[in-house]
């Protein structure tokens, strides 16, 4: 029998200390990784529920196990809320991750060795959009498109590549692109060559849910997303469609289960249901509007301090800063900012002279800082501190600048906690 006083702290102090240290790190560091966010206590409560014990292979009303009556309620709630949130006709809430959602889409609609046309990882795409090191680049014949020297998608180049390689599927979406994607243009190109248009909106799903970034649902045959990132829910995946093709919906359904996954994670689906309810609240739209405002405010500071911002700005939650002109590496910038309790990630920039593990840039995102309450004035000050640190790399005053910046970071983090006590 389990008792109420059982706890990790007494049973496994080494693990407990790691958990406590991570709690402290999140509270005392400013999180600027574009793919990270903070889940609400309600979401975390659902993840820690007794649904973690339940096997529920199948779908609501069609399970292979008994005792699923409450799991059915949870999953149907998540499905219905996601449909309302995104304007979808079809939703599958079972994918364990965005990558598994993407794998299910490929498996449903195309065959091994079919050609896919996706965005180059080095130009802002994702591993699962056809990178050679990914299953998507090994199982399928992957052709890649990129961005111009100005940091924008060249739709005519996409069209020409599509005409040349005749893909069965065009993959749109990104992990490091700061502008608006013309979903209608991508569908036009897909229709011209008879391809499916598959959109991975993982990075901008929260913005789309709030109506501050254009939705791909009216144009794509199928859309996937993660449920964390801008959406701010648990770590997981989601498949959606509004194409109206019941045959596609059936293929997607069977591609998730039984083709790619067994039992769904019902506790995570419960957390997704909470997340979708939160995203339907009026204040969620204000939050997402502020995410974009904060990103734009930071961009202006970096530009004023003579740092190059790829595409010269942002229309979403993220932007890339290039250090090619400064001769600085993304790895060095990442490390220096980390010493000051500012967390970013090194990122390749277009035509990057450095290797992918070194890079010449960093990616900055505002979902997490905005969620903990940072306003435009706060992120402008933060961007200035970051530039101070970057300017000092290799100079005699570097350690002093790091110490001064860290003190400022700790002060604002104390004033704007992630989880108020």
Curated annotation (Swiss-Prot):
EC annotation from Swiss-Prot or TrEMBL: 2.1.2.1
Family the entry assigns: Belongs to the SHMT family.
Gene from which the chain derives: glyA
GO molecular function, one term: pyridoxal phosphate binding
Annotated Gene Ontology cellular component terms: cytosol
Phylogenetic classification of the source organism: Bacteria, Pseudomonadati, Pseudomonadota, Gammaproteobacteria, Pasteurellales
Pfam families linked to this entry: SHMT (PF00464)
Protein name: Serine hydroxymethyltransferase
Subunit structure: Homodimer.
PANTHER family: SERINE HYDROXYMETHYLTRANSFERASE
Cell compartment(s), UniProt: Cytoplasm
Entries under PROSITE patterns matching the protein: SHMT
Residue(s) carrying N6-(pyridoxal phosphate)lysine: 229
Pathway membership: One-carbon metabolism; tetrahydrofolate interconversion; Amino-acid biosynthesis; glycine biosynthesis; glycine from L-serine: step 1/1
């Amino acid at each position: 029998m389990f008792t109420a006083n059982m706890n990790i702290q007494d049973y496994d102090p080494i693990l407990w200390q790691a958990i406590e240290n991570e709690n402290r790190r999140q509270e005392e560091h400013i999180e600027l990784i574009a793919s990270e966010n903070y889940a609400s206590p309600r979401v975390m409560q659902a993840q820690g529920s007794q649904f973690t014990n339940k096997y529920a292979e199948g779908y609501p009303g069609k399970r292979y196990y008994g005792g699923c009556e409450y799991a059915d309620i949870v999953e149907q709630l998540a499905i219905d809320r996601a449909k309302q949130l995104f304007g979808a006709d079809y939703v599958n809430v079972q994918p364990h991750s965005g990558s598994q959602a993407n794998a299910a889409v490929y498996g449903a609609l195309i065959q091994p060795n079919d050609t896919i046309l996706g965005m180059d990882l080095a130009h802002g795409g994702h591993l699962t959009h056809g990178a050679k090191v990914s299953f998507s680049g090994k199982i399928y014949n992957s052709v890649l498109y990129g961005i111009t020297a100005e940091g924008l998608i060249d739709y005519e180049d996409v069209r020409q590549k599509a005409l040349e390689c005749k893909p069965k599927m065009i993959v749109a979406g990104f992990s490091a692109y700061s502008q608006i994607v013309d979903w209608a243009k991508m569908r036009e190109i897909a229709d011209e060559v008879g391809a499916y248009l598959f959109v991975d909106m993982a990075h901008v799903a929260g913005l789309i849910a709030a109506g501050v970034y254009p939705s791909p649902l009216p144009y794509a045959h199928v859309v996937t997303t993660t449920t964390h990132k801008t959406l701010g829910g648990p770590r997981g995946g989601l498949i959606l469609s509004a194409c109206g093709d019941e045959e596609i919906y059936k293929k997607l359904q069977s591609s998730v289960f039984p083709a790619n996954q067994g039992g769904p994670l019902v506790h995570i689906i419960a957390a997704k249901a909470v997340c979708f309810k939160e995203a339907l609240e009026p204040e969620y739209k204000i939050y997402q509007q502020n995410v974009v405002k904060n990103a734009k405010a930071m961009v202006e500071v970096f530009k004023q301090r003579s740092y190059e911002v790829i595409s010269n700005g942002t229309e979403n939650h993220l932007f890339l800063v290039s250090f090619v002109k400064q001769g600085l590496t993304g790895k060095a910038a990442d490390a220096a900012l980390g010493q000051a309790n500012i967390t970013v990630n090194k990122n390749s920039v277009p035509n990057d002279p450095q290797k992918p593990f070194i890079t010449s840039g960093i990616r900055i995102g505002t979902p997490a800082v905005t969620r903990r309450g940072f306003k435009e004035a706060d992120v402008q000050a933060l961007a200035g501190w970051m530039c101070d640190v970057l300017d000092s790399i290799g100079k005699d005053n570097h350690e002093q600048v790091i110490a001064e910046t860290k003190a400022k970071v700790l002060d604002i983090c104390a004033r704007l906690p992630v989880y108020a006590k």
